[in-house]
């Protein structure tokens, strides 16, 4: 559902579609510069990163393979428990590759820091995080984001 169809339920738009696309273009240019000539793998975190990943891939001036992870860190509520389970692991061996985790928004940072540590244990050349948005007021751990 888009903002036009939310009617009275929508108080205000925090970030416009144009601002989102401009930020994704900026991120794509940074990624292209940093990973030029490197064996890059984009890793999306399901399900939230699907749209951001699709838009980011369209904005990239290069092609890069993509893989997906799905994890769960929410118990019965909506707050992160900090206990993470892998629901869908990568299909790709990341040994020696440059891994860029793509996320839509960082909330507490607990799940993302766990994913990063998990991927770092698999001997990649590097693991970095790319996110469109973050909620600094919700942060429970410091997550280093490019």
Where would I find each of the regions flagged by the language model?
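PRPP-associated nucleotide enzymes
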Residues: 1-146
């Amino acid at each position: 559902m888009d903002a036009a169809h939310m009617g009275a339920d929508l108080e205000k738009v925090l970030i416009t579609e144009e601002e989102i696309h401009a930020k994704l273009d900026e991120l794509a240019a940074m990624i292209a510069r940093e990973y030029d000539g490197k064996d890059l793998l984009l890793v999306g975190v399901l399900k939230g990163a699907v749209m951001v990943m699709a838009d980011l891939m369209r904005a990239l001036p290069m092609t890069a393979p993509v893989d997906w992870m799905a994890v769960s860190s929410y118990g019965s509520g909506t707050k992160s428990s900090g206990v993470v389970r892998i629901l869908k692991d990568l299909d790709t061996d990341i040994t020696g590759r440059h891994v860029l985790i793509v996320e839509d928004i960082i909330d507490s940072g607990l799940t993302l820091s766990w994913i990063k540590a998990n991927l770092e244990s698999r001997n990649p050349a590097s693991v970095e995080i790319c996110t469109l948005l973050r909620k600094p007021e919700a942060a429970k751990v410091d997550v280093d984001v490019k």
